[in-house]
C-alpha cells in the first residue's frame, strides 16, 4: 500500500504527484503496491487532477468531507461545501475510481446526533467502499480553540460524543460496512 496524504496533497499541482510516482516507479516500489491512495479535499481537486491521478496509477481516493452540514463545515474552517464534495465524488466515479474513502468527523462544534444521522444517510446512499470516522482533536492556538475559549463555540460533551460514535458504528454495520479498526469501516474486501 502506498498512501499520499498527511494533509491535502490535492492542493498542489498534479505534476508534482506525477513526479513522486515516477520516483517510486524508478525504485520499483509500485510493483507490489495493490492500493495507491491520495487524500483529496473537495475544495482543491479538479477533474484534470483526477484524470492525472488515475493515469499515473492512483487507484484509491480518500475524500475529506467531515460533515454534510454546510454550517458545520464553515464553522470548522473547511473551504468546501457538501455540494463541492458531491461534485468531487461524482467526478471521481466518472474517472473510474472504484475505491473511495469518505472521511467524517464526530464531536464537532455544535454538532448533534441529528447532524450525524443526516450525514450518514447521505453518505451511505453514495455507497463508498470505505468510511473513516474521526473525533475532533482541538489543537492549541487554532481558530477553533480560540473560539471555544471565548465561548463562541461549544463542543458536544463526552457522553454525546460517545453516543455519536456508537450510533455511527451501528448505522454503518447495518449498511454492510465492517468495523475493522477504531475509526475505519469498509465494505467486504476493502479493509
Question: Residue locations for each model-derived region?
Answer:
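C-terminal scaffold of the Radical SAM
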Residues: 1-191
Amino acid at each position: 500500500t502506498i498512501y499520499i496524504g498527511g494533509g491535502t496533497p490535492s492542493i498542489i499541482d498534479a505534476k508534482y504527484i506525477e513526479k513522486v510516482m515516477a520516483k517510486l516507479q524508478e525504485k520499483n516500489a509500485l510493483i507490489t503496491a495493490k492500493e495507491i491512495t491520495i487524500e483529496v479535499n473537495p475544495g482543491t481537486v479538479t477533474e484534470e487532477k483526477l484524470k492525472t491521478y488515475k493515469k499515473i496509477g492512483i487507484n484509491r481516493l480518500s475524500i475529506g468531507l467531515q460533515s454534510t452540514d454546510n454550517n458545520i463545515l464553515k464553522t470548522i474552517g473547511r473551504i468546501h461545501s457538501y455540494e463541492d464534495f458531491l461534485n468531487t465524488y461524482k467526478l471521481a466515479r466518472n474517472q473510474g475510481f472504484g475505491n473511495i474513502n469518505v472521511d467524517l468527523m464526530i464531536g464537532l462544534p455544535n454538532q448533534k446526533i441529528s447532524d450525524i444521522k443526516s450525514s450518514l444517510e447521505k453518505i451511505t446512499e453514495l455507497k463508498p467502499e470505505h468510511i473513516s470516522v474521526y473525533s475532533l482533536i482541538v489543537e492549541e492556538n487554532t481558530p477553533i480553540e480560540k473560539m471555544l475559549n471565548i465561548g463562541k463555540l461549544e463542543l458536544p460533551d463526552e457522553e454525546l460524543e460517545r453516543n455519536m460514535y456508537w450510533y455511527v458504528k451501528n448505522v454503518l454495520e447495518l449498511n454492510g460496512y465492517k468495523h475493522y479498526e477504531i475509526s475505519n469501516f469498509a465494505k467486504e474486501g476493502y479493509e
